[in-house]
Swiss-Prot record:
The lineage of its organism: Eukaryota, Viridiplantae, Streptophyta, Embryophyta, Tracheophyta. It is found in: Cell membrane; Secreted, Cell wall. It holds the Pfam family CYSTM. The chain crosses the membrane at residues 24-40. This is Protein CADMIUM TOLERANCE 1. One of its GO terms (molecular function) is metal ion binding. Keywords: Cell membrane, Cell wall, Membrane, Metal-binding, Secreted, Stress response, Transmembrane, Transmembrane helix. One of its GO terms (biological process) is detoxification of copper ion. Confers resistance to heavy metal ions (e.g. cadmium (CdCl(2)) and copper (CuCl(2))) by chelating them at the plasma membrane of root cells, thus stopping their entry and reducing their accumulation. Binds to aluminium (Al). Signal peptide: none annotated. It is a single-pass membrane protein. GO terms for cellular component: extracellular region; plant-type cell wall; plasma membrane. Belongs to the CYSTM1 family. It comes from the Eukaryota. It comes from Oryza sativa subsp. indica (Rice).
Amino acid sequence: MYNAPMAQEMSYYEHVQRRHEEKGCLYACIFTALCCFCCYETCECCLDCLCCCCN
């Protein structure tokens, strides 16, 4: 028998969108800001998500 295929990993943007849908805009924005704080840099993806998480 074959094993089930592995689930695809979510992109960062998809993860933020899911948080936005589940917990709301404020949570998604805080999640995005903390990601940049934890990696000690502001990446372009984080800025895109921060600007778009409330859309």
